[in-house]
Structure formats: structure tokens, C-alpha cells
């Protein structure tokens, strides 16, 4: 650490760089070389890497010098200094500082070998280089240069300007090279990659100037790269570009997978649709045959004829000829036309599947979903409707999956970047601490003592001031709210555990701050400290000490003050600065994350008695602030940063107002202005508090000089400003004035005034939304007067607030600044109302809508998220802007001329089209359009005018860089701005705003009136006592309604609230006894009439955060009752107040088959007839009937039958298309079937009523659904019977039968899960939808202001031409023409327009989904004034309105849906499957590994054949190399297939035929060889069967190709599918791990995606039935034609699949919006009685908008959410040390050692097996000792079980851990359950014990041999005696070690066996073995 510390501050740090300094460096370098020991073995290399010093991140070049160094001494600015960083002590470097303290590092070697660091020229160059003016000049030059680049036709003199620019850049580079050196050493010119850019740009400039290179414009485009220089000049941009490059690197795997998948799909497309898109309807030539027969030659050129466009059938209004196909379900030609291949492909010939490259482009377009509806319609028309399946596959796998994988990877890269920033901040904090420690040691003791005294004084002062003034209510939590990232959540879990540990330690130590024992203190804390509070906020710093814990704290003396507000916090909250900071782990060092969530459970309690003697003050906008005192500055991840006057960047909390004048301290609390009579704290006092506190809290160990330095750095402005503010902005002039202020304050601050203002905002918005075209003068007058009134009201509010609060405090609050701004604009608008062109100011009034955010948390959150994203993305936005600029200029330079010269190719009139690149603005628009995802159409134009290659490259680059990477980074940031806390607890910490207070007051008033009325009634009618509780119950029911529907704590009334022995409330229940609630958190619970009931499945157990203290019941019951009465809840609340009736039902056992009661208790009490005695008579029979019905209904067969009926009845609906009238039989069958189904469903419902009773039936949502659907069928059945079937109401009711399939939802588990998840998400989705609507409302009203009435135009219906403005200028001119020619000419309006707010919404939806937006934009850009004829691009800058809307309305708001859904997923996951939340990382690792290995077991390998030849072939075929060769052949086969084209020559066709034949032979050989070697086992493997089928088809296909292709699919298709086999080799390739992860993510997603697919199919089914019944007969135009329509069920499904991705929904909607005269009401349809072809606009709009929202925004986004979720899971899993693959390879290798799959391996084979495994499980040889040390259990026969080996090896990889044992036990049980074979084998020894035995045996043998050797020297008799004695002795010796020295068997044996018996057997066996050894030796 010491190496990283900075040198001590002060003048000593700054040492000029002299020749001596250089000599010292050289000396140190020489010393370090001598010290370096020679490198031994490479094993310690890694340790060396870690221990090596690293450069200090704070002292990197380009960063500001840390403030701890103080000011730069006089004369040392811009002078070379010795390096501050210890890392560079042994490197030749020096640093230079400029005035802004920016650090520049240079190489101390001579620059260009000539200029030493002490050379005058070099020093001058350095001075120039580091001067801020120099970089300013360069920056201005770059920007000016950029402006010049945008000129499409630069003037003559611009050439000279160009030379100037080149000169300046050359000068800059020369200065850099002289100052730094060229390229040899570190920190020289070319060592910085950004300088490469400069160098290349300058070189290109000179090259193009002096060398003639032909196409100069292409080279000139390189100048654009100069714009990139901005990145190197602006500091923050380099890092963001670094992040971008990182994410691009990470994308490599996804890119490979994407290209692979697209290639496969392109191949399939090539085989299926080759040449199809050239099929056109050609007029059959009349004289064709005659001219041919006369002279034996053709009379005309056939080729020319079929390629002549005039012979093709053209659809009116379409540019392309009609396509057709020869299959029955393809498009048909009109009479007289023949379908044949003719002409070129559609879209200039670029849309086709004729070659692999065009097919690939088509697939890429499909993947990015750009104008894919056109490709879809063309292909289906040419090939047939069945090929819709191909598109479904590509859209779901290709588009949704691959594109979102890119998003997932970019999001993950961003997340990692975030994490890195976080860790860096952590590291800096540690370094900072260490630094301060070092400084502390260097201080004189006297100074330290002085500091301590000063700190003491400060604390007393602070507390005294607080006590006197009663100020100190903390900073509002809304300011502290932060959009946290996922990592914060993970850290929170770790913190929970740490906190619990701390608390328990605190209790043991008796720490008074953590645990309060005394009763009096309890009481004090329960009352908390209460503070007068209003909206006047100032910032103020106070001590980091627990004020609550100081006995006699002045705060406590204020608890009786009338103006108090109840506020509470947990006791563990306030810590002394020395204790571990429990919040330091969070994103910013405030209590936001952990504490905010902790309290969210008990939010309602915060709303306390808010009345006070100064009742005007009870209306502060954010009341009941909870007191927060935070620890010293911790790392701040997502703080905003501001730059003060000194250029010092300071980090401030997220919501804090930057404009505040106070010196920004790090521990801030908001002070609220006091009640009357209080002294106002002067500015100077406040500033001094800030200073003292700063000294105390952050720098309590820093020297006095440093404190001053810090002071300066923290000040935002010079002191004179504070003086000015104090004098002029705080008005304290006269007592009368102060009195007036108090009165005004009383009025303005009341919650009811806030409510009134909010109502005014809503009304004002309504008034603005009521504008439309055309309006009557009276209505216009009403709106104008309304506007004046509202402007008056808001102006009055502003002035009154200014009086009440003083300007200084008024402008401290953001909302007030906002109000002031809007009021000023409104007043300005009134004064400038008549000025032409300023009507746009009216639009600013719309911003008032945002004032709703003050009282609407979700809107507030949305604005915060957008603000946060834009703020955090400032740099990224800049990068995006640079990218857009560069590409726009490149486009203009490269293609601008081509557009002008070749315009006739793309426009018949030879006029530039709307989308071109001839000037910068249009070029910018094209690039922006590409960013929006629409690139293909503009690219076609570009390719047509400027050549294919260049356009493809440029457009692809924009698409990939701009759209896929940068935009996804935007989206990733948006998603990371989301967190579960945001939507659940939007209102920060659930505190009340004034609106809620006023609503509560009103409710209390109503409730009080009710109670009084009820009491009055009681007195009159003498009701029974039992009814007395009812008013309260009703009150609480109402209360529950206003509370958000979160599960959590239910509070309900209960008469008997008891305490058990511990003083714990028994109402909490045993299941949650550990969650006993803190007194000061839960004093409201002490009410004897309350119990708390906690559902077990608490989402994220917030109770974990609470301390386990007893709940005391001291507070008075009455008070609590009142407090509960004004309880309300924010959205974030998890409390529901419910009547007592709703107790949790006890789970009944399944066998309990008695039906529930029929009626509710209320019914039975009121109607005695409902009470039935089931013991006797009719009652008994009724009961038996009910039980029988119950048995029937509960039976599985009944449910199956009903499902079958539902499916049949749904299927029947699909037949009711427009042809039903003609198919009489089907119609009759359907009519009868409908009746039968209706009767069956009625019977089912009656049975269920009887069985379940009305209560159970009607309390189930699914039953209600059934009931409503049956009711609809019943009504239509009765209407039919009575003959009313033709009534309009009945007809529309019949369409509701389309909802029948919904009944299937409750029956299919998979769909029900998805629906439940969706239903859970509905509140937040609706919330976001509502917020989006408000957001869009502003744009819609603005659109009405800008475009209302301007979209009309005069049009010739026959020629379909719009008149020019010189012929028709306005509506009057058009009407004159119409008089002359009434039928042809019309004054029309564009169908989608901005004539009113509703129409505006529809237009904006089309713009946001990028469908149909072009026509809307064109109309806007051509618009002039209301009722004037449009002029082509007459209002071109209106494009900007749409650009802004797309960024804010589409980008942010639509992507919020993804955010909300993902968020909901995470919340639900926590609720249900969140057991892993409570696992440590270590445990999780083990758990995952065990989960994987538990699911596998050894399989029996295919036995090797006994026949010798078969055996050889078997070995050959089963080798890995054989597989790889086959894979390579498959890939080669694919390549040859890619070469195929539609127009290939005969010769080419023959070559390909023979190549294909060779491959078929190869694959046939493979098949034959495998069948020969594997025998019948060949067919046990799925892949083999697949190969076999493909081979057979290929062989048959060779001979019968024509027949097969005619009736079936082309057999080549199967060869493409064979590519799937490549998946098998991915496992063998080490480098393919990333791709495996991606595929693994897909596999994991499949089940969930299947469920979502089912739901989507159901939605499509219902909508297509609905579409058939409503839009079957609409006119064929725009998107509806003979194939794509709602006439039949199939066609409807094809259309709905298309608009699932929102593609082309505008085209389908347009014909439905037709009203006469655009359509006819009398048009007859042959074969049907229906008349007319008009649509129904309102039904149509509802139909499409609801479908878009359900499918495109919700279901598709769920798909995205699942992919993102599973990708992160898969990535985590792939990061695990052991993956699924490792276990698979383990078992694969196991098969070779255990061919019979016995699950055992012999001990002698263990070493070979361990060595044969692959990393990480491999134990390389020599491994004997390591294996023995593993102590593996062995069974008889010296065999070891595979699971034991796997456990041991896993343990070796993961490391040992005590937490393993339980998991291991579980796994073993699981394995034994799935593999019963293990049970029979009990271990009798272990490898370690075996080794010990062997060693013992060797020792004994040696000893025994010794005895034998000595035996010859002794007499036989004596020897025999001795031998006898020694034998017994030896026996003892031999038996002892083997039993005594070995550990017991308990660890390896199963508990149910007798240990004794086993030990005995073991002893016998050993004795036997030793005897044998002895005998053999003898």
C-alpha cells in the first residue's frame, strides 16, 4: 500500500526536474537491475504480476492533481517537475502541471534524439502544448472545420480555409512531436492511439493535395475523421469510447453465432425461394403461335417480350408489378395473364433469394425487422402461404433471439463497466483513508489536539443551534432516491447478514448505541424527534453522531410541540463515524437502499396527526421527513457532478439542486424554515456550520492547511455572492411584512391549495387538449379565456409563494424554478400572441403537465430515469452525435453527387427524392432513419445511384455501430436505471405529499360523517350490539381500497390481542416469530385492537432487517386508533388493511371432498330459506346431490372433456369466414355444434354452481371468465331462437364468442403461469402506459398546435396526382375546380393527421413504431397553413419535431415497457424461487455444481464387437477425429450449396451435380460404416437416425428429384438441416465456450418461450376471429389485398403474425378507416348477403392499438425479458469453475473405464482414469499420493463408486468448505434414489486406509524377514520356544496397528449397518491376508 501513497502535500512535493533528477532516475534504474534476482521457475510469475507496483490511478496523465497537494507553488506552473507517482521512480519521466492543475506526463529522453528535457525549444513547446488556450484553439478549429465540411457546394474561397486548417493541424502535431518525442519511448507522440488519427488525417491531406489519386472525393471523406479528434480533446469521451470498444469485443461470439444462424437460414431461403420473386403476371401474346409456325422461327424476340415492363400486370398505385406463384396457395394472376419468370427481382432487383449473398441480405433485413412485411408479402405471394412457417422461425429465433442477445451482451458489458467504476471508487476510498492515516502520523501532536478541541466545539454548537432553532429535519428522501443497478441488490443481501451479525455483537457487548435497554430511552425513541417542517429547504451539515442516542439531546425536549410530525427510524441507524458504515456498500453513501426498503413495509404510519397551531404549516409538500445523518463521503457511483467556480468537480446527491448557493458539504440534511417567532439563520452562520462540519466529518484527521484547501474546493461561488443573497434575496425588512408573510405562508402552504393547483393543472391540460380543427369562434373564445384564467392562477401562486418564502428560498426548490420558468413563458406568450411564428411558445404551456410529477410518483420516476439516463449518458450522447455527424458527412461526400447525377434511376420525374444525401441536412436525416432501424429502402436508392459495394459498407457500418451497439448501450443504461425499488416504492420512502394529505383529510371527513350518521341511526333504531363494529369495518374496507396491491403485512382489527410470555404479540403467529418488530418502527402495532398477519411468501423479506426486540404496548390505544385512521399508503407500501373476515384459509387435505357453502353468511342471515339442514329430508338429498356433482367436477376426465369441448368450439369459430354462406352443409353443422357447445358449457356451469357453491365459484377470477363467456353464448342462443339474430347489438355480442379460447388459459399450466406473471405486471404496465400517455399528450397537443388543419390537399382521384400550388393554392381554389368536375377532384385530408388530440395520439403511435410514419412526416414537412395546398418540403425543419419525439417519445417510453417487465420478472422470481438469495457465493457455487452432477449418471457404452474387422471399424468410427472430419465435410457441402445461383450456366450445374454426388457417396459411406460397426445400436442414437433419413432422401433425390420437388419439398433442404450437427462439435472446441453459453441461454429459454408462444398464439387466434367478424368485407387497398386480408381464418393469422412485430399495421388500418366517399356502403359481395366495403374506424383503431400493445409491447417484451434473464444466468453458469460439459466429459471418459456401467471402477485403474480426464477435473500423473490423500471410500473388490470420485474431484476444484457436507448429503440421497444400484455396496475401506495398510504390511514383512535371518544362530529348541513366544506377541502387534491406528469407518459407511459386524469382518479378512503373506514368505 505504501507504494501507492502520495507524497506528503505542500511545497516539498513540487520539485523541479533538473539534470540531477535525471541522474537520480538513471541511478535508480541501475540499482533495480542489480537487485533483480534471476528468474527461477515460471511458477511464481503470477505472484510477481500481483506484487508489481502499478501506476496510481489518481496521478494518471490527463487527470487533475488531487486536492491534497494544495496549490502549485509560485513559478512551478508549466515547469517540468519530478514525477509524483512512486511507480515512475525507475522510469525516465517527468510531469508538468498547467493552471488548472491538470497533469501531463512526458518522457525524459531526448525528443527526436536532439531535444533534451532542458532544451529551450522543447520547454516552449511543452508550455504551448499544456496551455488551456491551445486546446481551446484546436477545439474551435475542429468545430469550424466540421461546419465547413457540411457544405455540399463549398464556395471558391473555402479552399484557402482548408489550407489554414491543415496548417493549424500540422502546427499542433509539430508542437506535440517536439514536446513529447516521436515514437521511441513511452508518452511520445505515436504512443497515443489518438495521435495516430491526427497523423493519418494530416498525411492524407498532404497526399491528396500533392498527388493526383483520381477519386478525390472518396479521399476527402477521410477529413471527416477529424471530427473524431473532438473525442481526444474532450476528457470524458475517451472512457466512453473505451467502453464501446469493450462491448464490441464482447460481441464477437454473438456476431459469429448471428452470422452462422443467418447463413443457415439464408441457405434454407436459397433452396426454398430461389428465382421465385421473379414470377410475374405476363400478358400472353396473341400472335405468339402463328408467327412461330409460318417460317419455323419466332416472329418476335421472346426474351425482349417477357422483359418488357409494359407486358406485366401492375396494380394501380403500386410501383412494382404484381408477383404470383404456381402453387395453389400462392398469388394468382387475373384472367388473360400467365404466371412466369420474367424481368428483374423487386426493389431494383435487390430483394431476392437467387444467390447466397442476396439471400443473406434478405435474412439480415428480416433479423433487423426493417420493412420485412414487404419481403414477407412478396415471398408468400410467390411461393405460397405455407411458407409463413419459415418466417415464424426466422423472426422468433433470428430476430427476437439474436438481436436481443446483442442487447444482453451490451447490457452486460455496461454492467461490468459500472462494476469496475464501483471497485475503483472503493479502492480510491481505501487509498484516501490510508493517505489520511499517513498524514495524521506526520502531524504534530499539538495540532491534533487543537483539531480535537475544535471538533468538540463544533459538535456542541451544532447541537445547540439545532435545539434552539428546531431545525434539522433531514434532507428529503426524494433527493436521495437513486436508480440503482442490480449489483446494489446483491450487495444488499450481503449487508443484511452483516447487519444482523453487528447487531448480535452489539447486544453481547452491551453497546448503548446499538441496543437500548432502559425503558425510559425506549419511550424517548418511540416518540422520536419531531420537527416543524415546511417546504423552504436549505442545506445544512450536522455531526455524524446519533443525536437520538445522546441522553438529554435537545431534540427530545421538543416532542410535545404542537407542530410536531411523527417520524421514526430504526435504532441501528445512527452510528458513530468509527463504526463500520453499513451504507458504504451502497451506490451512494446514504441510507437509501437498506433503510428505505426497511421502512417501506410500514409506510402508512408516517402519515401522522398533521394539524398544528400553525395549521398553515401542516401542508409542507414533503412532510414527515425521517431524520437521516450520514457517514462520511463514500464512493458515489451515479452521482451527478457539478463544476464550481474553481473548476473543481464535486459530487452531489442525485436530486440535489445544483443552483443552491450554500457550500456543498458531504453530510447534508435539509433544514425546514421555522414557525413564527423563530430566528432566521443567517447565511454566514450556515456557511460556518458547513465549514465546521466538513472539518469534523470528512477531514477530522487532516491538517489545518488541508481544511482550507478543501473549503475552497467545496465552495460553489465566491463569498460576495453569499453576501448579495443574504442582503437582497431574503426579505426581512419590517415586522408587518413578516406578519403578512406568515399569513400568506399559511394559505399557500396548505395541502388544499396544492390540491386546487393540481386540479387547475389537470383542467388546464384538458383545455389545451380540447383544441381541434375546425373550431367554432365561440369555442375558441372559451379556450382563450380559460387560458387567461389559468395563467392568472399560476402567476398568482408564484407571486404568493415568492412573498411567503423569499426569492432565495423559493428558488432553492427545483419545482419552483420550473414553475417560475413556465409562468414567465406564459406571460411572454400573452404579450407576443400576435407575433407571427411565435405561436410555438404556446407549446411551452404544456410543460405544466409535468407539475403533476410532484404528486405522481411514477411520472416523477420516469422523468428521473430519463434525466438520469441523459445525464449519465451525456458523453455517450456526444459520441452518438459525433457518429451521426461523421456518417452524415461521409454520405454527403461519397454519394451526394451521385444522387444528383443519377436521380432519374430512382425518380421518374428526375427530381431528388425526399431521402437523399445531396446536402448535409438530408444526409443527417438518412443516418437518423438508419438509427431508427430503417435502412433497407434508403440503401436500395443509394445502391441504384452510387453502386452497391460502397453503399453496403457505409449502411452496414451505420447499422451495426449506431443501431446495434450505441443504441443498445442506451437501452442497457435505461434498463440499469430501473430497479425493483423504483416501481414498487416510487414515492421515495413512501412519504406523503400534499395531495395525499388533502385526500386523507377529505376521507377522514367523509368517514367521520359516516360514523356520526351511523351513531345517529343506532340511537334511533336500537340495533343489536353485534352491529356496532360494522362502521369501522366498512371504513377499513374503504381504506384497503386506497392501498396499493402489494402483498406484505396485513393489519386487521381483532378484539383479543394477547401477549405471550416474551411480550411478543401472539397475533404475529409462529411462522414469523423471528420477525418481531422494533418498537420505534412499529409503535402503532401496540394498539390492543391490532394484530399483524404476515403472509409467509414475503417478496424479499424486509423483516430480516429489523431487530428482534419485544413489542411493547405502552402507547395509548386511543392515539393509535386515530393514527391508524389517517393511515394511507404509497404505491410502495406492502401493507394491506383488511377486515378481520379475510383470515388465511387453512389448507385442507386433498381427501377432504365436501363442497363449500352455497351462499355467504350474510345471505343466510338475511334469507332464512337459504339455510338447509343437511342431516335429514330434502336437505340430505340436496347434500348428496352436491357431493355427487363435486365428485364429477373434480374428476380428471371431466376436466379433459371440457378442455376438448373448448378446443372444438374454438375451432368451430375459425370456419365462420366470408365463404360460410356458400357452404351450406358446414354452416348447418356449425349452427347445431354451437347449440351443443352452449348446452354443454351451461351444464358445466350448473354442475360447478351446485358443487362449489356460489361463494367459491364467484370468488374465482377464472370462473368469472367462464361465466361471462357462457352468458354471451346463452344470450345469442336465445336471440337466435326468438329471431332477433340480425339485431346490431346481438351481432356485436356474437363477436364476443371469439373470447371462448380464453377459457383454455386456466386449463393449461404453462399459459396460466405466463398470464399470472402478466397479471402481476399489469399495475406497473398500466402505470407506465399512463405515464407514456401523459408524455405523449404533450407531443400530441404540440402536434395539434403545429399541424391542425394543415394536412388537407387537393387531389385528382382519376390520375392520382396532387395539384401544384401554382394551380391550386388553397381550399377555395380547389372548391372552384370541384364545381367544374365534381367526381374527379376532391379536397382530401390525410387519414392519419393531427386535427385533434385523439388523432394525434394515433399518428404518434405510428411514428413511435416507425410504421406509416413517413406519410405523416411528409404531410408535416409539406404543410403550410390551415386549408392551404401543401408545398413539397416547404416546411422542411418540421422533421425536427419528429426527431425529438422519436428520441423522447419512442426511445425512452417504449423501452420503459421492457424495463418494467424485466423488473417485474425479477420481483416475482424473488417472491417464488428466491431461495438462493440467502446463499453465500461459496454455497451457490457448490449448489450449482452439485445440481449439475446430480442429474447425470454413467451410461452403458456400446460394446465393442468381437469380430476383428468390425472391431477395427468400430475403433475408427468412434474416434473424435472421425466426427470432426465428417463435420468438415458437412461444412464443405454447405459451401458448395452456397455457390448455387438461380441463373447459373448448364456447365456450372453439372459440376455442382457431380460435387454433390461425391458428398452423397461420402455420407453414404459414413452411414454404412457406422451401421457395420455399431450393429443394431446404430439406431439407438437420434443423430444417426437423422443422418440415415437424410442419406436415403439424398440417394432417392438424385434419381427422383423432379417428382419429389413437384410434390414435396426439395431434398436439398434436408442437407441444410444437417448443419445442426455442427452443434455437436462445439463441445470439442475450447474456443467456442462463448457460443456454447449463448446456445445454452437459448436452451434455457425454450420452455418459457414456448409458453409465451402459446399465449401469443391464443391472442392471435382470438384477434383473428374478431377480425374476421368485423373486417372481412373492407375495401382492398393499402395493406389489404386478395391474399392479406381478414376474409378467412388463415389470412387473418398471416396478417396478425405480421403485425406482432408491429410491421405494416398502418397499411392494414388504413382501409378500415375508410368512410364514404372513399368507399361504398352499397357494394354487393357475391355469395354473401353483406353490403358495403367500408370499415369501422373506432373498432379498427381499438383492434389494432390493443393488439399492438398486447403483442408488440407486452408479449414480445416478455420474450426479451426472458432472454436477457437467461443470458445472465447462462453467463454466470459458464463462469462457474465446473460446467455441465465438464461433468459430461467425466462420464464419457468413465464409460471407457467402466464398459458395463456398473458405476464402479477398480482401484488400480484410478490413476489412469484421473489422468485421462480433461481440465479442470484432471489430476495429472504422477497422481498416486494426491489420490490417496483424497481418502476415497472403497467397496469389496477394491472398487470405487463414480459419485465418490466425482465428489472428491469437484472438491479439489472448488476448494474445501464446511458448508459442503449438507449439500453432499442431499446429492448422495438424490443419486441413490435415481440409481438404486449404489445401495447394495457399502464401503469397507478407503484409499488412504488401504495405503496405511500396505505400508504396515511392508513394515511387518521387513521385521519378519529380520526375525527369520536371526533365527539360524540359535538352538532349534530355544528357537522354537522363542518363536512360540514371539508369535503371540507378534499377533498382538500385528492386530493393533490395523485397528487402533486407523480412524473409524463412520464417515464412509451408511448409518443403517452394524459397525461392529463390519469391523469384525475387516479384521478377519486382514488376518487372513497376513497369514497368506506369512505362508508365502515361509
From Swiss-Prot:
Residues 1-132, 180-193, 235-253, 409-751, 802-815, 856-871, 975-1197, 1248-1261, 1308-1324, 1459-1521, 1570-1581, 1630-1648, 1764-1978 are cytoplasmic. Residues 152-158, 212-217, 274-355, 381-387, 771-781, 836-837, 891-919, 941-953, 1216-1228, 1281-1288, 1345-1397, 1420-1436, 1540-1550, 1600-1612, 1667-1688, 1712-1740 are extracellular. GO terms for cellular component: axon; axon initial segment; dendrite; glutamatergic synapse; membrane; neuronal cell body; node of Ranvier; parallel fiber to Purkinje cell synapse. Residues 1936-1947 have a biased composition (Polar residues). It catalyses: Na(+)(in) = Na(+)(out). GO terms for molecular function: sodium ion binding; voltage-gated sodium channel activity. Glycans are attached at residues 215, 289, 295, 308, 326, 1356, 1370, 1381. III repeats lie at residues 1178-1493. Its main location: membrane. Pfam families: Ion_trans, IQ_SCN5A_C, Na_trans_assoc, Na_trans_cytopl. Residues 1893-1922 form the IQ domain. Na(+) 2 binds at residue 373. Keywords: Cell membrane, Cell projection, Disulfide bond, Glycoprotein, Ion channel, Ion transport, Membrane, Metal-binding, Phosphoprotein, Repeat, Sodium, Sodium channel, Sodium transport, Transmembrane, Transmembrane helix, Transport, Ubl conjugation, Voltage-gated channel. IV repeats lie at residues 1502-1799. The voltage-sensitive sodium channel consists of an ion-conducting pore-forming alpha subunit regulated by one or more beta-1 (SCN1B), beta-2 (SCN2B), beta-3 (SCN3B) and/or beta-4 (SCN4B) subunits. Beta-1 (SCN1B) and beta-3 (SCN3B) are non-covalently associated with alpha, while beta-2 (SCN2B) and beta-4 (SCN4B) are covalently linked by disulfide bonds. Interacts with NEDD4 and NEDD4L. Interacts with FGF13. Interacts with FGF14, GBG3, GBB2 and SCN1B. Interacts with TMEM233. Interacts with the conotoxin GVIIJ. Interacts with CALM1; the interaction modulates the inactivation rate of SCN8A. Belongs to the sodium channel (TC 1.A.1.10) family. Nav1.6/SCN8A subfamily. This is Sodium channel protein type 8 subunit alpha. It comes from Rattus norvegicus (Rat). The gene is Scn8a.
